Curated annotation (Swiss-Prot):
Originating gene: fusA
Species this chain originates from: Lactobacillus acidophilus (strain ATCC 700396 / NCK56 / N2 / NCFM)
GO cellular component terms given for this protein: cytoplasm
Location of the tr-type G domain: 10-285
BP-aspect Gene Ontology terms: ribosome disassembly
HAMAP family linked: EF_G_EF_2_B
Localization (cell): Cytoplasm
NCBIfam families, A to Z: EF-G, PRK12740.1-3, PRK12740.1-5, small_GTP
Function: Catalyzes the GTP-dependent ribosomal translocation step during translation elongation. During this step, the ribosome changes from the pre-translocational (PRE) to the post-translocational (POST) state as the newly formed A-site-bound peptidyl-tRNA and P-site-bound deacylated tRNA move to the P and E sites, respectively. Catalyzes the coordinated movement of the two tRNA molecules, the mRNA and conformational changes in the ribosome.
Protein name: Elongation factor G
Length: 697
């Protein structure tokens, strides 16, 4: 028998808490869990016992790395909360959670207002069309300035943000808030850990200011709501319900962002912000239809939350849980799913069985029999599912748009300290790359080194630390490396002759090969132009193979040789002594002999680099790109920032994240992707050859 849905869709909220690092986001989430009855003791991030920060690294560093999903209940609503990291190296976690959320709470530090990472997460939320409310936190701090924080939302983010509350006092004197819609004051009792407050008429000394601010709020709402505008201009009374309905509509349309005040640490204002989540953020029924694609026809299919429709969900996170093993976090868009059922992984076209379904609370869990549309839950038993995969009813396959995964920007070698560590490291890297698509691991066939790449130095530090702690792997970390290549720039004909006579059967292979540069990206091409059997048919594949093997270690510094055409046009053989092995060696000798005449050069990877910076740092940023041998491709404006497009050699990009951070006071960000290979300048080529101990021709 089908299970009954516990909360109606209209009373469900899927929200994220997003902020700059240290704005008090984890503490805010803690308080939400405390006041909604999910935890009985308040944990503090700075004491290392916060409920949401459940990985050991997070507890030590006091920052949130993994977005933990938690279910809470406020009044008669279910709120699914995803706690997201505020550090720029963990942007994928933020992207992931925004992708599956319906609304978000942006937490600001009342002292700092909008900070660099706030700009980044705000831009990401704009990309995914996520409605937001703002919580100005840390009102108890010296220097807290609510009005300045609201102003920073306008100036830095160009957001139509308006206070729906006014703080009573600040720093030591902060004691509560005035509700500008209902025109009442909520004043907290210091002794009750924020669970008790008195709702009283607005104190006389705040009345005039509160009236002024309410008028400003109505004016801001009138700008985005015709009905309110009409009443406002006509001097008619606007009821509280009308005002709330207009704010909700404008917030859902991304035209308005209500701002709240509070101090999570001092237990003030969190409940009113929770009311804001219910009043102004969307239920799964309020969001735009979700667009999926039919894999058979390619047609677009619109998904609206509906339990009766076929099941469709997105796997948005894989975690290795200490108690249940591999855990897949899913967001259900339509339909329902019982534990024990089979689903189709439409992204990989394979059937999988969902063993158990769990509702998550930071790092504890409750088993549930069924999930419904709009739910966020953990699934156990999905062995082949990875981040971004679509899980659907086996008879109704759909591909839900996958996550935008940025490419890693830093790569280092990692070496196990012992043979025993080697096997454990392979298992650890496989698990960690499954969990995090921006973390990659590969073995370099040229050096045998294992290379790991990620979004920044902190990202890789934490991955190495997790290998040590969770998988007991001790490893040494090397310096960042660049994968160079070699190629020919001129035509060259060369002979390769291999003759060996050492008693008994000898060795004989003789070839003439014409080498020419190939088009970029075309790789190696072999042409057989032998006439009259001067090289017998059976030895020709050996010539091709010999060349391919020789090209793995180039002629200048041992880097792979690429984009070369080889035409075998002459040669000779010996009736008895010729063999496949002899022709293989002859081919490699021809390649070596051609090198000096073929204008061999070392190629370096050139990255397409996009830097986003506030305009005031533009000169410094452009100067820094030029100093790194970069070439400018163009510039554009976006959301109050300048975007610079350029091409820069990868070898010059090491340490750039730190340089950019310091030259833009942490407000600049960049992305880079591999674009093409290009010859290195002569002086740099000589340095590379010297370091590798090769011979410059």
């Amino acid at each position: 028998m089908a299970n009954k849905r516990e909360f109606p869709l209209a009373k469900t909220r899927n929200i994220g808490i997003m902020a700059h690092i240290d704005a008090g986001k984890t503490t805010t989430t803690e308080r939400i869990l405390y006041y909604t009855g999910k935890i009985h003791k308040i944990g503090e991030t700075h004491e290392g016992d916060s409920q949401m920060d459940w990985m050991d690294e997070e507890k030590e560093r006091g920052i949130t790395i993994t977005s933990a999903a938690t279910t809470a209940q406020w009044k008669d609503y279910r709120i699914n909360i995803i706690d997201t990291p505020g550090h720029v190296d963990f942007t994928i976690e933020v992207e992931r959670s925004l992708r599956v959320l319906d609304g978000a709470v942006t937490v600001l530090d009342a002292q700092a207002g909008v900070e660099p990472q706030t700009e980044n997460v705000w831009r990401q939320a704009e990309t995914y069309g996520v409605p937001r409310i703002v919580f100005v936190n840390k009102m108890d701090k010296i220097g807290a300035d609510f009005d300045k924080s609201v102003k920073s939302l306008h100036e830095r983010l160009n957001a139509n943000a308006q206070a729906v509350q006014m703080p009573i006092g600040s720093a030591d004197t902060f004691e509560g808030v005035i509700d500008l819609i209902n025109m009442v004051a909520d004043i907290y009792d210091e002794d009750k850990l924020g669970s008790k407050w008195d709702t009283v008429p607005v104190p006389d000394e705040y009345k005039e200011e509160a009236e002024k601010r309410r008028a400003a709020l109505i004016e801001a709402v009138a700008d985005v709501d015709d009905n309110i505008m009409e009443k406002y201009l006509g001097g008619e009374e606007i009821s509280n319900d009308e005002l709330k309905a207009a704010i909700r509509k404008a917030t859902l349309n991304l035209e308005f962002f209500p701002v709240y005040a509070g101090s999570a640490f001092k237990n003030k204002g969190v409940q009113m912000m929770l009311d804001g989540v219910i009043d102004y953020l969307p239920s799964p029924l309020d969001v735009k239809p979700y667009v999926a694609h039919d894999p058979k026809t390619g047609d677009e299919v619109e998904l609206m939350a509906d339990d009766k429709k076929p099941f469709a969900a997105l796997a948005f996170k894989i975690a290795t849980d200490p108690f249940v093993g591999r855990l897949t976090f899913i967001r259900v868009y339509t339909g329902s799913l019982e534990s024990g059922s089979y689903v189709l992984n439409a992204s990989k076209n394979s059937r999988e069985r969902v063993g158990r379904l769990l509702q998550m609370h930071a790092n504890s869990r409750t088993e549930i029999p069924e999930v419904f549309s709009g739910d966020i839950a953990g699934a156990i038993g999905l062995k082949n599912t990875t981040t971004g995969d679509s899980l659907t009813d086996p008879d109704h396959p759909l591909i839900l748009e996958s996550l935008q995964v940025p490419d890693p920007v830093i790569q280092v070698s990692v070496e196990p300290k012992s043979k025993a560590d080697r096997d454990k490291m392979d298992v650890a890297l496989q698990k960690l790359t499954e969990e995090d698509p921006t973390f990659r691991a590969e073995t370099n066939p040229e050096t045998g080194q294992t290379l790991i790449s990620g979004m920044g130095e902190l990202h890789l530090d934490i991955m190495v630390e997790r290998m040590r702690r969770e998988f007991n792997v001790e490893a040494k970390i090397g310096e960042p490396q660049v994968a160079y290549r070699e190629t020919f720039t001129k035509e060259a004909k060369a002979q390769g002759k291999f003759v060996r006579q050492s008693g008994g059967k000898g060795q004989y292979g003789d070839v003439w090969i014409d080498f020419t540069p190939n088009e970029e990206g075309k790789g190696y091409e072999f042409e057989d132009a032998i006439v009259g059997g001067v090289v017998p048919r059976e030895f020709i594949p050996s010539v091709d193979q010999g060349l391919q093997e020789a090209m793995k270690n180039g002629v200048l510094a041992g880097y792979p040789l690429i984009d070369v055409k080889a035409k075998l046009y002459d040669g000779s053989y010996h009736e008895v002594d010729s063999s496949e092995a002899a022709f293989k060696v002859a081919a490699s000798l021809a390649l070596r002999n051609a090198a000096s005449k073929a204008g061999a050069v070392i190629l370096e990877p050139i990255m397409k680099v996009q830097v986003t910076t506030p305009e005031e740092y533009l000169g410094d940023v452009m100067g820094s790109i030029t100093a790194r041998r970069g070439t400018m491709e163009g510039m554009e404006d976006r959301a109050g920032a300048k975007i610079i497009n350029s091409f820069v050699p990868l070898s010059e990009m090491f340490g750039y994240a730190t340089t950019l951070r310091s030259s833009t006071q942490g407000r600049g960000t960049f992305t880079m992707v591999f674009d093409h290979y290009s010859p290195t300048p002569k002086s740099i080529q000589a340095d590379i050859i010297k370091k590798r101990g090769g011979d410059a021709e």
